[in-house]
């Protein structure tokens, strides 16, 4: 018997609605980007994927995994990134077209965990048109995380088990790890006043690991995206 003849039980399980399966949740992070001594190079991807999976688990929306690419502003140099157009045209659009074809998805929420990916916001309408999908770009993670590889990411990372607590002192070495707070990234600080302001704060006040804060940040991001799922039903 052909698998196409199998009637799927869309109303089974602990889900918001049988229609929730038409909503996809996919993470967009950055897999190869320095985060000091205490966080791994794929911190953004791990945080975004965790939030995306938890939202899919709690709502029943279809978990679509993660995009493999990321982009970045040309004045921020702390990792390996794609040009924005390559990310959009060679990674995101083809992957979403395949997702729609295979799973009959109608809407996709992109859970963003990397600030540089904000460059693609101007292309969301294009992505939607090319893929024939409703696209929602959610920034709930990065809107609250603060300076790069500092308190926000360290705290969320600690909750997830990816922060190396034994390396926090080494993490403070801005000469060896200039990307932490972007303290040592002169070009980034010269080009973006907000980055410079945050870097000055980190130089003066440092950072901390706060498990309660990290848990709250992860849960608040999930709650915001869950509300987006509900709006789509």
Curated annotation (Swiss-Prot):
InterPro entries: Creatininase-like_sf, Creatininase/forma_Hydrolase, FAPy_deformylase. GO terms for molecular function: 2-amino-5-formylamino-6-(5-phosphoribosylamino)pyrimidin-4(3H)-one formate-lyase activity; ferrous iron binding. The keyword Iron applies. Requires one Fe(2+) ion for activity. Requires an additional second metal ion that could be Fe(2+) or Zn(2+). The keyword Iron applies. Transmembrane segments: none annotated. It catalyses: 2-amino-5-formylamino-6-(5-phospho-D-ribosylamino)pyrimidin-4(3H)-one + H2O = 2,5-diamino-6-(1-D-ribosylamino)pyrimidin-4(3H)-one 5'-phosphate + formate + H(+). It comes from the Archaea. Pathway: Cofactor biosynthesis; coenzyme F420 biosynthesis; Cofactor biosynthesis; riboflavin biosynthesis. NCBIfam families: ArfB_arch_rifla. This is 2-amino-5-formylamino-6-ribosylaminopyrimidin-4(3H)-one 5'-monophosphate deformylase. It comes from Methanosphaera stadtmanae (strain ATCC 43021 / DSM 3091 / JCM 11832 / MCB-3). The gene is arfB.
